[in-house]
């Protein structure tokens, strides 16, 4: 089983028990998310390819007392939305978990815009 699939399986189990969990995604093409999206339409939010806005939505949900998991490709989640992550989840110490796929050169075939060699360094600084 892929790590991603194991993670989604655990999120599904958690959502069965706790409706204060929200799963936000910028990855609309991931078939692995189909079952989660169908079973929990009120707790699964597809934010489109707009990672910065997705982090702002996550901040709002967390401020209302929810636990939020944010899922996207590493270069866009760690780098494009760095300011939102810092000011939302980081400075306010909110229960937002960032889950990324394609770390390092995981999507190297998509070109340099999809490289994520500095994602850990940026995220750890927060």
Language-model-detected regions and their locations in the chain:
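Thiamine diphosphate
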Residues: 1-126
